[in-house]
């Protein structure tokens, strides 16, 4: 999405703590005009040094719902001090819409969202509030923020990812212990049966935003 809007020749520093993700990203390089440098780094540490590298824009993907409020405050303030533009993609916002509907869907979504707010390695996570919190912080720092939804829309043919998501949600709900395990198991059986019949669709809510400092408008 972002790449075609930038100059043909680009350099990206890719930062993650998972070497497998870094290799996958490097292998997927779309053009010889794009150079990549992979950096294995635990973002729970002194990540500010990553923001101090020469950069025109900083991007994140599926991150801001996992971090704590204090981590996000450090990130936004340091980005503002460097006058960096930030593009944040795929921040989960708490919306899960499943079809066909099941009587347990709302309770399961509540349990999943509670789990999203547990510690993911950065302190208590913001979970579904991550995008809203980040946008508010950037705006308070004088940034112009443009936002929009970027929901996952998962169709009947996408059985593999549906099964993986359902199992992950069931596991999360069990960890929260707010619902009887038997009810979670029955919900999972009903939902998987709909997937097997190719009758199941999903919409999982996400938000994208770009935050631009006033100095480069």
Which stretches of residues belong to each language-model region?
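Regulatory N- and C-terminal appendages and interdomain linkers associated
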Residues: 24, 29, 123, 199-201, ...
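Short, hinge-like loop/turn segments at secondary-structure boundaries
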Residues: 30-32, 104-107, 164-165
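A conserved beta-strand element that flanks and buttresses the S-adenosyl-L-methionine
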Residues: 58-59
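A short, conserved alpha-helix within the catalytic core of class I
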Residues: 46-48, 64-84, 88-91
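Conserved Class I S-adenosyl-L-methionine
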Residues: 135, 139-217
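Class I SAM-dependent methyltransferase SAM/SAH-binding core
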Residues: 1-48
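Conserved catalytic/acceptor-binding region of the Class I
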Residues: 84-149
